[in-house]
């Protein structure tokens, strides 16, 4: 029995990025593999013909490479933290149908997937929680969810493609709250500068009827811009297209490597890592 997805629903907004991760796995098999996305797409009753057609253009294929690199980079940071904190909480903020937590599972960590209640309802159908895993319905800006995370063994939080839709003040409040609640933990997320965020916003701001793009979270120099938020923050960043992988693979053209460099250097596409020091 396939899981039917209707057009113009919350479910549809979840399966488009899922489909993108499947396409990434096909286009760049040496660089990225999301078995869960491939498997879930098979279980879904939905007309993917338009998404399939749209996925094969030049810039769409580069967009797929962006998705692949972002997921790989965040997973690298999660695994790196687990090396020194094997019993940590691995927390996916704004998880959608992403299975990065599972792909990083070391057999002893605790996995938490957080998103809005209507999203978690779909996730529970398609990706029910496994061992040491919990799907938590919440609004990330309402910090009641803090109490549901067992961070006794440390915690690594990650957000993929999430904070572009947050106001700068919302990200700041969340980071400050996390510094209070989770000393010794780490938050990693992707970010970009104002120019890039304006380009991202073009698609969704029209429907959201939001005028002031400038209020939305964007970063050029993460260390100098975010460190003043709180004295306990240790902020580092690296380019998310080429900062973790040189992309010297037969599936990636020289033109795409050039675009990747433009993204990292001119758009400041980056993975930001925020370490939370001890309590004040």
Q: Language-model features: where?
A:
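Rossmann-like AdoMet
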Residues: 1-91, 95-138, 151-152
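Short amphipathic alpha-helix with an adjacent loop that forms part of the alpha/beta core around
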Residues: 143-152
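A conserved beta-strand element that flanks and buttresses the S-adenosyl-L-methionine
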Residues: 157-158
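A short, conserved alpha-helix within the catalytic core of class I
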Residues: 165-178
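Conserved beta-strand signature within the Rossmann-like core of class I S-adenosyl-L-methionine
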Residues: 178-194
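Short, glycine-/aromatic-enriched active-site segment of Class I SAM-dependent methyltransferases
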Residues: 198-213
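Short alpha-helix
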Residues: 213-240
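Conserved catalytic loop of SAM-dependent methyltransferase domains
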Residues: 233-258
